[in-house]
C-alpha cells in the first residue's frame, strides 16, 4: 500500500495510504462483500469503505487505488468486488485505479500508470517481500520484544523514502 502510494505521488497524484482495517472496516467489508469471498478481500474493501465513511475525504474528489494480481488468487477480482461494494454503498461515482493495463471493467477510464511508476513498483515489491521474509525469520530470536518490527518499519521507510526521492536507484 505504501509502495503504491509512493509510486503514485511520484507521478504527481495526491495519494494516501489507508489505515489498516479495524472493527469498522471489518463490519463494512462483511456488509458489502459476499461471505463466500475470502476474509482478506472483505478487509481490504472494508478499509476503503471505512475511509469514505470517516468523513476525512471528499467523495467527489477521490479515487481508490488497488493493486491487481493476475492469477488464481481472488485478488484478481478485488477490483470488481470493490466496484460492486462501492456501488451498493452509494459510491458509484468513485473511480477505482489499478495497476492493470487492460481496463476490462471500465473502472479507471483515462488513467494509466506511467512507466516510471510501474518500474518503481516492480522493483520495490520484491524488496518488501525480502524484508517481510527477514522479519518472519528474525522475530522469534529478538532479545527485545518489538525490535524486529521496529527494524522492519525503519527499513521499509528507507525503501519508500528512497523510492520517492530518487526512484528505483534510491530504493
Where are these regions (language model features)?
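An N-terminal assembly and electron-transfer interface module characteristic of large anaerobic redox
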Residues: 1-171
Amino acid at each position: 500500500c505504501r509502495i503504491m502510494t509512493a509510486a503514485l505521488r511520484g507521478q504527481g497524484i495526491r495519494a494516501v495510504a489507508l489505515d489498516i482495517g479495524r472493527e469498522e472496516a471489518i463490519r463494512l467489508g462483511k456488509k458489502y462483500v459476499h461471505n463466500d469471498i475470502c476474509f482478506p478481500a472483505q478487509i481490504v474493501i472494508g478499509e476503503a469503505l471505512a475511509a469514505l465513511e470517516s468523513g476525512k475525504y471528499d467523495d467527489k474528489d477521490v479515487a481508490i487505488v488497488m493493486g491487481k494480481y493476475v492469477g488464481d488468487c481472488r485478488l484478481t477480482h478485488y477490483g470488481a468486488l470493490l466496484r460492486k461494494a462501492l456501488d451498493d454503498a452509494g459510491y458509484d461515482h468513485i473511480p477505482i485505479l489499478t495497476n492493470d493495463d487492460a481496463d476490462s471493467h471500465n473502472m479507471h477510464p483515462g488513467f494509466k500508470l506511467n512507466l516510471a511508476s510501474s518500474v518503481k513498483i516492480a522493483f520495490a515489491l520484491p524488496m518488501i517481500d525480502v524484508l517481510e521474509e527477514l522479519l518472519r525469520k528474525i522475530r522469534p530470536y529478538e532479545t527485545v520484544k518489538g525490535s524486529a518490527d521496529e527494524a522492519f518499519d525503519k527499513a521499509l521507510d528507507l525503501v519508500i523514502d528512497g523510492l520517492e526521492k530518487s526512484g528505483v536507484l534510491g530504493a
